[in-house]
């Protein structure tokens, strides 16, 4: 195991620590000054084998002294808030009760951490595995048994944990890692592509309904036999649900207020729209920018579109060729995880429910066919270049029923 001081501190110190069974022994045998530096979050620790760095611990910004980590318990478990992502230096594990992260610089480390996150049986029978667990412990990513509130697993989160964090992109287990720009305060997720399609704002009631009438009229309609909807209708349902009304940046986070209630204004929900036969949008996938209220079109082949439309047909009975549009709710787990620990998934499902009801009210007012779905249990992978891979935790289809016309016709 190697201890290092980052060069931005002023000078680099590399000290080989021989004979230490764990990184926690730094405070007892590494010297008083070294221990002080470690408490300040200045030192990083690497797992090195045959001159190759397998993983390294990157301390986050610390405003107070950092106490030595508590020993992790066995069986070894990652905290519910732990997740994998692409950071500035590649795959990394983050999301504990600190801003620390462990950069996974080898395929072995990625696969080991992915098994840990998937709650698979992790066998610790070699020095590298023990040292990697020490790194994860230093970063505050393992269950220690001391903080029951943040380490407790809710039943639903335990059941769906793998769905929100894991895919088959990396090895046998694989972490769901999106190639996103990393920021320590987890800002609102926005599309990466520059191309945008602006969506309008029209808060006027199309049918002149009162709120009570819209509540009474809403229902799950499975008829897309009318003239195709377009960006105006898609804009209306997104405007009433996911569009961000106000952003507020603080030292620790970026809070976003929407028209629906969200936990601490830290919702990790975003959306991908699949336009199957919209009259003014090309067939394809579009990532929604909730800040600017725009759609960012994907490019390249999108083989997953037909799979999603096939799922919608099986769940709703609407013919595959008649489906006009779908909305996929995507969870950016990292954004709320720092504050909500084990209840992130439950909180996100409540937010999906609120968004679906807002969409249902707008659809009733506009005479649209709106049908929430369930059972996708998939990701946005394969929807085209520019669409980041994320866990889909809710879906709905949107169209115009037979016997109705577009507004203005």
Tell where the protein language model's regions lie, with residue ranges.
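Conserved hydrophobic/aromatic beta-strand scaffold that supports enzyme active sites
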Residues: 285, 326, 395-397
């Amino acid at each position: 195991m190697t201890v290092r001081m980052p060069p931005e501190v002023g000078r680099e110190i590399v000290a080989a620590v021989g004979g230490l069974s764990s990184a926690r022994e730094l405070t007892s045998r590494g010297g008083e000054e070294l221990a002080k530096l470690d408490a300040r979050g200045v030192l990083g620790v690497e797992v090195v084998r045959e001159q190759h760095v397998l993983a390294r611990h990157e301390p986050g910004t610390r405003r107070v002294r950092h106490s030595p980590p508590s020993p992790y318990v066995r069986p070894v478990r990652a905290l519910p808030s732990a997740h994998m992502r692409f950071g500035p230096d590649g795959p990394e594990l983050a999301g504990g009760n600190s801003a620390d992260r462990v950069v996974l610089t080898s395929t072995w480390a990625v696969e080991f951490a992915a098994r840990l996150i998937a709650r698979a049986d992790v066998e610790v029978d070699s020095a590298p595995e023990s040292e990697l667990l020490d790194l994860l412990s230093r970063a505050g990513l393992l269950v220690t048994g001391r903080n029951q509130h943040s380490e407790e697993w809710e039943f639903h989160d335990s059941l769906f944990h793998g769905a929100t964090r894991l895919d088959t992109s990396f090895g046998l287990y694989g972490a769901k890692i999106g190639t996103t720009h990393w920021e320590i305060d987890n800002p609102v997720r926005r599309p990466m592509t520059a191309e945008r399609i602006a969506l309008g704002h029209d808060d006027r009631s199309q049918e002149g309904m009162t709120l009570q009438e819209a509540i009474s009229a809403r229902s799950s309609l499975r008829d897309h036999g009318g003239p195709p909807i377009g960006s105006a209708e898609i804009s209306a349902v997104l405007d009433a649900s996911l569009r961000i009304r106000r952003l507020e940046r603080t030292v620790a986070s970026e809070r976003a207020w929407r028209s629906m209630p969200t936990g601490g204004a830290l919702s990790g929900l975003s959306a991908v729209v699949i336009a199957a036969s919209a009259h003014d949008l090309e067939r394809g996938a579009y990532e929604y920018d909730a800040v600017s209220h725009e759609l960012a079109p994907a490019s390249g082949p999108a083989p997953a579109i037909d799979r999603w439309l096939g799922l919608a047909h099986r769940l709703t009975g609407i013919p595959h060729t008649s489906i006009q549009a779908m909305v996929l709710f995507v969870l950016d787990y990292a954004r709320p995880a720092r504050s909500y620990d084990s209840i992130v998934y439950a909180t996100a499902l409540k937010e999906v429910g609120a968004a679906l009801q807002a969409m249902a009210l707008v659809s009733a007012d506009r005479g649209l066919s709106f049908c929430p779905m369930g059972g996708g249990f998939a990701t946005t992978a394969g929807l085209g270049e520019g669409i980041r891979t994320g866990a889909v935790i809710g879906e709905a289809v949107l169209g115009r029923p037979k016997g109705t016309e577009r507004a203005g016709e």
